[in-house]
A protein has these predicted regions:
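Family-specific signature for flavin-dependent thymidylate synthase
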Residues: 1-190
């Protein structure tokens, strides 16, 4: 079981494609994201103008989320109060109702928290696919860190875990990164 924090909703979409795992994910419905953190991809981080534009977009999303939340909460609170709900309870319920729709403006870069459970066989499959150089950078970094952690707990069991090229030929065929020797060395020393 892994507790994963500081990853994007984009990573969440990828990792939940592994149906061989059990997931619990932080709710955007019940957890307000007024001051959400976000993940900046390294390629964007490396270009000052791109980074500036990205941060501006995230700040705009944050402000839009807050404003939508306020507008929706006020509307829901009024409806609930008029329907006879206690004002304090109406305010609390209205905020949660507002989050439901305001969250649609949030970017895939928005951070989230995940708890994931996988058995050893499933982990081997996950590592073979997601530690590969062809995997998207964020999930590759997560998979590599997860592998490092499990190797620390059970080095014999996970000795041969990693991308497919660690145990034999690259599974990517013509799309191979061409770095099998370096990859094997990297994962042998992980």
């Amino acid at each position: 079981t892994f507790a994963i924090e500081g990853v994007s909703r984009s990573l969440l979409a990828q990792i939940t494609r592994h149906r061989i795992a059990s997931f619990s994910v932080q709710s955007q419905r019940y957890v307000a994201k007024d001051n959400f953190d976000y993940i900046i991809p390294p390629a964007i981080e490396a270009i000052p103008e791109a980074k500036k534009l990205f941060i501006e977009a995230m700040e705009h999303d944050r402000e839009t989320y807050k404003k939508l939340g306020e507008l929706l909460a006020a509307s829901h609170e009024k409806e609930l109060t008029e329907a006879g709900k206690d004002p304090k309870d109406a305010q609390k319920a209205a905020k949660k109702m507002a989050n439901e729709d305001a969250r649609y403006v949030l970017s895939n870069a928005c951070d989230t928290k995940i708890v994931m459970t996988m058995n050893v066989r499933s982990l081997y499959n996950f590592f073979a696919l997601r530690c590969c150089e062809r995997a998207q950078w964020e999930i590759r970094a997560l998979a590599t860190e997860m592998l490092r952690l499990v190797k620390g707990v059970s080095p014999v069991l996970f000795k041969n875990a990693g991308p497919a090229c660690v145990r034999g030929n690259c599974a990517e065929g013509g799309m191979s990164c061409g770095k099998a020797v370096q990859i094997r060395e990297k994962f042998a020393n992980l």
